[in-house]
Amino acid sequence: SGTVMPTVSGAIAAIVGDRLLGRDVVCPLAPDTRIAAASAERVVDALIAVHDLPAAAFGHTRAMNLPSLSLTLAELADASARAAEGAGVRVGAMRWQPEPRFQLAVDQWPKRFESARASRAGIRADASADEIVAAYLRDNPRALA
């Protein structure tokens, strides 16, 4: 029947991590909830790129949004299922059970981040939910059931 995650970030992370371990997941958000997402791999690449930029590249501020992929939680769940299938392992079941307090919070989040400055520096977003899941698996080689 699955475990309800007590935090929003935990609920979103479980769509990939727990399901790839064969655990059933109950998500307190609707499947069509859209979020801005980035793999840890893309974030690390961005931090290295920013570190290597000359100070002049920043202009008057060093603040910069990192680009992200806009995706729905259903797209993330589907990508997890495809990754498990491709690896020949059982993916945990996915059940959607929206809770108004969580849904309201996430509905207020940005759905995408774009940054011309980041693009000029060669920093890019993940191309797809499948790319995010593949990066997760590279970072967590024992993440499959």
Give the location of each predicted region.
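Short aromatic/basic micro-patch
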Residues: 37, 70, 112-113
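Short, surface-exposed alpha-helical segments at coil->helix boundaries
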Residues: 13, 74-78, 112
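Mid/C-terminal beta-alpha module of Rossmann-like enzyme folds, strongest
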Residues: 19, 44-103
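Generic structural signal for secondary-structure transition and capping sites
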Residues: 24, 55-56, 141
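NAD(P)-dependent short-chain dehydrogenase/reductase
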Residues: 1-34, 40-45
